[in-house]
């Protein structure tokens, strides 16, 4: 059986990748990821049972988060990494099972009739006692790659035959993957939330439960959104308490004459360590793609060698990494399989991986030694300039709340007629040029609220301002969509509205991978309706599941700029 993956927006033919991922993922990597997810779901069965008797294994919880994060689109392409995670996952599953048994938990086959009356009726033959077996994912074991390969053929997405059940199971799983990314970043800053871990176990274990109906899974999907909000709140707290609240900042997009290191991804703790270790070395540090918003945090402004942002969204890296000349550090997704011409300059860390690239691990305390990449940088030429100028950002919730009076007055006077939330992801599809054209053609009395790398479609267009308020307000990384939600809730409060959907806010969101999925589910949990997703709707939404989202939440796609503009503006 060939691979099957449809977790991202680039799913081939908007159906699924079956030979090789459009992302560059090979068939053997895809299947090893399938098996790892299967093992993680099996661990979650014991994670749920453990919590029933007070057993919480933090090593297991962290392993779950890292494993889920590693399977996100464009994070890790190294099959050997997944094989090792599968082996370790099986070990941890057994260890957790033994801990649950020791605590008095029931880890064997359970019975549906648990109360005393049912048991008595069953004993006298008046009621059948149904045995519910542990799912195979909680019991299957192997210790060699041959058996791993054989099992991986049987446990992929298509193992669930019912199209709607499959669709909802995958929607939940992808949401949990996105949530795992945010939890991992918070964990790296020593912030955690046990309740979120507990829910992740519950949700993943539920995807193995064949007794759950479509309605059950729809409810669980919305509950996933609830924990998406909590996960983004946790990361917002971690980032702001560690580095301060983002503030309005001009970021240089040109270059200096020193050699440099380009840091990409999302992990601010990695950036902090790199900046500390490059002090006084003569090596500058530049951000790339989703690392741009790091410039908005006060704590990073003390580094004189924090030079600016180089390049654009992740998908342009094959040409931009070539021109940067120095080494690149990938802290998280999105990694594109590198060209041979610059492959020796790419370093990975955290959950990122690609065969042949140099990987930098953390020690037991979470500290990383970046001396090798710094020494590499010293031998390289300064970056080739690809653009000049500045871009402005830093409009997260705290900063916007400080401007609240100005914003509210602009709305009341009609200077601002409508806000457009255009958060989300960028990607290589030409159809995404829609978002550039859409931004250009928006009326001058509208303001764009953005977060995530979708901003690169319009953050350099110089769209002007309204009474000193920039028409593009960049809150930060994709997880900072949380700020956009808080801003909307604040406006609802200020204008004394009962429903968030009464606000003059439209949602035209570009999605790409699984973090966008958890952001979407979080918005649905908050009651936001009439969200439009593009450039295509997710391939993993079956017609019936898509219809549920349309009927209950007004989810829609996009068509063309002219027609959509009329639709949004009425």
Swiss-Prot record:
It holds the Pfam family Prismane. [4Fe-4S] cluster binds at residues 5, 8, 17, 23. Its EC number is 1.7.99.1. The gene is hcp. It is found in: Cytoplasm. The keyword Oxidoreductase applies. It comes from the Bacteria. GO terms for cellular component: cytoplasm. It comes from Clostridium tetani (strain Massachusetts / E88). The modification Cysteine persulfide is found at residue 425. InterPro entries: HCP/CODH (IPR004137), Hydroxylam_reduct (IPR010048), Prismane-like_a/b-sand (IPR016099), Prismane-like_sf (IPR011254), Prismane_a-bundle (IPR016100). Its cofactor is [4Fe-4S] cluster; hybrid [4Fe-2O-2S] cluster. NCBIfam families: hybrid_clust, PRK05290.1. It is an enzyme of class 1 (oxidoreductase). Keywords: 4Fe-4S, Cytoplasm, Iron, Iron-sulfur, Metal-binding, Oxidoreductase. This is Hydroxylamine reductase. CDD domains: HCP. It catalyses: A + NH4(+) + H2O = hydroxylamine + AH2 + H(+). Belongs to the HCP family. Catalyzes the reduction of hydroxylamine to form NH(3) and H(2)O. Hybrid [4Fe-2O-2S] cluster binds at residues 266, 290, 334, 425, 453, 478, 513, 515. Binds 1 [4Fe-4S] cluster. The keyword S-adenosyl-L-methionine does not apply. One of its GO terms (biological process) is response to hydrogen peroxide.
């Amino acid at each position: 059986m060939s691979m099957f993956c449809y977790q991202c927006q680039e799913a081939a033919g908007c159906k699924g990748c079956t030979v090789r991922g459009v992302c560059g993922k090979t068939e053997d990597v895809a299947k090893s990821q399938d098996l790892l997810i299967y093992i993680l779901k099996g661990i979650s069965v014991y994670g749920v049972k453990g919590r029933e008797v007070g057993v919480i294994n933090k090593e297991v919880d962290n392993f779950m988060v890292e494993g889920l994060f590693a399977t996100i689109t464009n994070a890790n392409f190294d099959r050997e990494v997944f094989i090792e995670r599968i082996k370790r996952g099986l070990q941890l599953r057994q260890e957790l099972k033994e801990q649950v048994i020791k605590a008095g938990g029931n880890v064997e086959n359970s019975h549906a009739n648990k109360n005393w009356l049912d048991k008595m009726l069953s004993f006298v033959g008046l009621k059948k006692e149904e045995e519910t077996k542990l799912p195979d994912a909680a019991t299957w074991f192997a210790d060699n790659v041959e058996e791993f390969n054989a099992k991986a053929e049987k446990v992929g997405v298509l193992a669930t035959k019912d199209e709607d059940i499959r669709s909802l199971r995958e929607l939940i799983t992808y949401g949990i993957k996105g949530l795992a990314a945010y939890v991992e970043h918070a964990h790296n800053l020593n912030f955690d939330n046990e309740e979120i871990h507990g829910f992740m176990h519950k949700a993943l274990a539920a995807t193995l439960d064949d007794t759950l109906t479509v309605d059950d899974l729809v409810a669980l999907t919305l509950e996933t959104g609830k924990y998406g909000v909590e996960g983004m709140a946790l990361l917002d707290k971690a980032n702001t308490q560690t580095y301060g609240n983002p503030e309005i900042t001009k970021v240089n997009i040109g270059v200096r004459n020193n050699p440099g290191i380009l840091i990409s991804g999302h992990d601010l703790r990695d950036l902090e360590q790199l900046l500390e270790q490059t002090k006084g070395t003569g090596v500058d540090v530049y951000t790339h793609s989703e690392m741009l918003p790091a410039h908005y945090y006060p704590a990073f402004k003390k580094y004189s060698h924090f030079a600016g942002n180089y390049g654009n969204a992740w998908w342009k890296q094959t040409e931009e990494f070539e021109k940067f000349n120095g080494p690149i550090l990938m802290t998280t997704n999105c990694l594109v399989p590198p060209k041979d011409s610059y492959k020796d300059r790419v370093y990975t860390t955290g959950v990122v991986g690609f065969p042949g690239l140099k990987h930098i691990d953390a020690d037991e305390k979470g500290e990383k030694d970046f001396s090798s990449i710094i020494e590499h940088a010293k031998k390289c030429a300064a970056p080739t300039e690809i653009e000049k100028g500045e871009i402005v950002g830093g409009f997260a919730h705290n900063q916007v709340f400080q401007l609240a009076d100005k914003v509210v007055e602009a709305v009341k006077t009609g200077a601002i007629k409508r806000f457009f939330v255009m958060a989300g992801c960028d990607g290589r599809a030409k159809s995404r040029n829609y978002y550039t054209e859409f931004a250009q053609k928006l009326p001058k009395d509208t303001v764009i609220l953005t977060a995530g790398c979708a901003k690169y479609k319009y953050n350099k267009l110089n769209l002007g301002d309204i009474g000193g308020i920039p028409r593009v307000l960049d809150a930060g990384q994709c997880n900072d969509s949380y700020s956009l939600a808080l801003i909307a809730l604040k406006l609802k409060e200020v204008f004394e509205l009962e429903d968030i959907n009464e606000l003059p806010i439209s949602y035209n969101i570009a999605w790409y991978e699984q973090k966008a999925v958890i952001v979407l589910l979080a918005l649905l949990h908050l009651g936001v309706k009439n969200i439009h997703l593009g450039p295509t709707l997710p391939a993993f939404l079956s017609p019936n599941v898509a219809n549920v989202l349309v009927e209950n939440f007004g989810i829609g796609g996009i068509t063309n700029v002219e027609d959509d503009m009329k639709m949004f503006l009425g």
